[in-house]
Amino acid sequence: MKIDFYYWAAQCPINYETLSLFDKYKDKIDIHTYNVEKDFDLAKSVKMFFPFLTVLNDEERFRAPLKSSLLDKLLNNEKCIEKPYIIDFGKEKYKGDIIPLTKDNIYMVSKKCTLSDSVCSCDKKALFLSKYCDEIFGYLNVENDNVLGGAEYISSKYVPYNIPKNDDYAFLTCLYHSSTDYDYKYYPLLELEKYLKNKYSKIYAITDAVGTFPNGNLQWFLEHGYVDEGVISEEKGYCKLHLVSKNI
């Protein structure tokens, strides 16, 4: 079995966890890894719009995080079907403490944004973001030291995906977490937009039409002042990705 794993450096903490996982399977699987941080042409050629993309045997594409259980099934020739995560979003906006996300508190997202509560993965993400962002990476919605939601960004000119790139454009890398109970995303995104308007004129994001990942869904963005720029990629049976934007 062959795996081609494309990843955007340490933009997502799961990337580091996945690379560590591969060490355990290097004698069982033909694994090739590609960091697209500086290779925009490669990201475009494989139609990459997630922080990581797995291609199995040069054919089957997976966007979900890889786990040992999945790799073991694949090694046993078991069929693994990736399904979109679709929920009814809670409408009531919930506001805890809205605080800046920085290198000093990025460890807080480890329980929600990693597969193994890996603080080390988050530290690597902080090093990555420090190359491209100011001191503030985004904003968190926090209650009792528990991260409820968050919004993160990077300048569009550093994004390897095939999106509009300009010094005046920001890109929303992560918007989390979607819930059936409350809207935890609204307030951190609102605070991030206020922060970014001092430097940028527009913010772009990628979202699925109906699924929760990435950042989704489209209707949520439309209800919060974003404009649908159209479909940029479609993964049959899994997602239809839209580019959305908002003048700030």
Residue ranges and their predicted role:
Residues 1-26:
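Local sequence-structure signature of Cys/Sec-based thiol-disulfide redox active-site neighborhoods
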Residues 173-184, 209-210:
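A short, internal acetyl-CoA/4′-phosphopantetheine-binding micro-motif in the GNAT/acyltransferase core
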Residues 196-212:
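Conserved GNAT acetyl-CoA-binding A-motif
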Residues 209-230:
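Conserved active-site alpha-helix within GNAT-family acetyltransferase domains
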